[in-house]
């Protein structure tokens, strides 16, 4: 799953035609990337995309450190602002339903860490992260807070042992 992180911010700061150009370029880069991996892309809703490919191409993308993030950052709005995406990847799931759930969790994790990165959730319930080079703009809204709280709650429920401590003792 892929999410166009800063679409609203870029749209707010640009004209309608500029916004359409940026959104189109982001979708084009993602489409070409999916096709280069023998997969395909489908737009889901406002800035969200489903990308399907096979394991060998995911491994190759990981080896290249998901260079698609760099290509997306090359899409500029004005002189200083770049487009960014976050991607959630599932590896080793037993079914398509499980893969979708894992990809959603991975995407939430990438967004929770500031966006502009890829989070890969693997079979042993570990995550691997790529990207995150641009300075993330912290969004403090109710939806984001709820997503982070739900993700944290899921991790606590799935854990056998939970330790909570302050920074001084960690």
Task: Label the model's feature ranges.
Residues 22, 50-68, 99:
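Short helix/loop segment flanking the catalytic signature motif in cyclic-nucleotide metabolism enzymes
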Residues 5-31, 43, 58-62, 139:
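Conserved long alpha-helical elements within nucleotide-processing catalytic cores of c-di-GMP signaling
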Residues 1-10, 163, 168:
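Catalytic-site or vestigial catalytic-site microsegments of nucleotide-handling domains
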Residues 97-98, 122-156:
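C-di-GMP signaling machinery
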Residues 26-38, 59-80, 104, 109:
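Alpha-helical scaffold within the catalytic cores of cyclic-nucleotide enzymes
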Residues 159-161:
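Pre-Walker A (Motif I) flank of P-loop NTPase domains
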Residues 40-52, 77-105, 116-123:
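A short glycine-enriched loop-to-beta-strand structural element that forms part of the catalytic core
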Residues 62, 66-69, 92-115, 138-140:
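Catalytic-core segments of nucleotide cyclases and related cyclic-nucleotide turnover enzymes
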């Amino acid at each position: 799953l892929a999410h166009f992180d800063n679409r609203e911010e870029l749209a707010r700061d640009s004209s309608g035609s500029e916004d359409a150009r940026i959104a189109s370029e982001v979708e084009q880069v993602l489409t070409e990337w999916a096709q280069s991996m023998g997969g395909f892309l489908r737009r889901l809703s406002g800035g969200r995309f489903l990308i399907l490919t096979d394991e060998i191409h995911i491994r190759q993308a990981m080896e290249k450190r998901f260079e698609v993030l760099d290509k997306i950052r090359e899409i500029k709005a004005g002189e200083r602002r770049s487009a960014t995406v976050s991607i959630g990847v599932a590896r080793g799931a037993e079914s398509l339903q499980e893969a979708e759930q894992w990809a959603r969790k991975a995407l939430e994790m990438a967004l929770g860490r500031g966006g502009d990165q890829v989070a890969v959730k693997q079979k042993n319930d570990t995550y691997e992260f790529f990207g995150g080079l641009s300075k993330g703009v912290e969004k403090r809204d109710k939806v984001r807070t709820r997503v982070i709280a739900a993700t944290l709650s899921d991790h606590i429920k799935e854990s056998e042992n939970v330790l909570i401590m302050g920074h001084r003792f960690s």
